[in-house]
Amino acid sequence: MAEALVLVEHTEGALKKVSAELITAARVLGEPAAVVVGTPGTSAPLVDGLKTAGAAKIYVAESDAADKYLITPVVDVLAALAESSAPAAVLLAATADGKEIGGRLAARIGSGLLVDVVDVREGAVGVHSVFGGVFIVEAQANGDTPVITVRAGAVEAQPAEGAGEQVSVEVPAPAENATKITARAPAVVDNRPDLTEATVVVSGGRGVGSADNFSVVEALADSLGAAVGASRAAVDSGYYPGQFQIGQTGKTVSPQLYIALGISGAIQHRAGMQTSKTIVAVNKDEEAPIFEIADFGVVGDLFKVAPQLTDGIKARKG
């Protein structure tokens, strides 16, 4: 059976949830083979988790240069593996980096590319949710080694103990024109779950009205142990930082529960959250498009509904 390569997502020595989801998806296409790219020592704390997730093989590509260049080292490693092992497909997370890596890799190896799929089927067929979830379509990429980016949270991880055979591979020296990282600035952080990894997301839109009013959104999120998101309208209005934007030009999420407060539901926003398992919308406009995809909707003032919901959850939790 041919291998299906999976680019491992990790941070601070821990696997991201989407890595297990990708390994599960890869199982449909071939024997899951995880690819870890990073500085020396990166793979050590990840091996057990990758075995548990079902990785039959773990390619370890470690180099001091791995975190000194944007994207290039990862593309180089995957391209080399695609040439040497002739995998059935290469799977990546549909993050900003994942999409760029996928695009560059497909161009490099002359293969087709499927972006932001919500499921993977035999024959390297990708399932897409399009037009705000109105249509579900299938697509198949051309080429010997299709490159597929998978939406985080769309595939349910199904652990299956794998052999986890470790194979060291070289990180090719970056080209002279490769973009080098010269400085780093810390991102805005909080104690909430990562937006793309969270099982519950509470988002606010233009209807929240101001940056100060976003405390209502945060309070509800904290009562649920949820991540906080924002629509593009809220971000453009300066209500919340851009790194929390959800939608076509922001992040894509697929949590078990998505609560939309004061979000009208433009198709661009829906593109980033429409595959959420359960959607709850609160909006004073009963004609708001968000209600078209909501499982539960409340037509009302979010500043009355959200605090009551927060208080009710806290009371239930004791």
UniProtKB/Swiss-Prot annotation:
Family matches, as Gene3D superfamilies: HUPs, TPP-binding domain
Disulfide bridge positions per record: none
Span of the signal peptide: none
Keywords from the UniProt entry: Electron transport, FAD, Flavoprotein, Transport
Cofactor(s) needed for function: FAD
Record InterPro entries: DHS-like_NAD/FAD-binding_dom, ETF_a/b_N, ETF_a/FixB, ETF_alpha_N, ETF_asu_C, ETF_asu_C_CS, Rossmann-like_a/b/a_fold
SUPFAM superfamilies per UniProt: Adenine nucleotide alpha hydrolases-like, DHS-like NAD/FAD-binding domain
GO biological process: fatty acid beta-oxidation using acyl-CoA dehydrogenase
Source organism superkingdom: Bacteria
Binding site for FAD: 257-285
Quaternary structure note: Heterodimer of an alpha and a beta subunit.
Record function comment: The electron transfer flavoprotein serves as a specific electron acceptor for other dehydrogenases. It transfers the electrons to the main respiratory chain via ETF-ubiquinone oxidoreductase (ETF dehydrogenase).
Record-given protein name: Electron transfer flavoprotein subunit alpha
Organism: Mycobacterium leprae (strain TN)
Gene: etfA
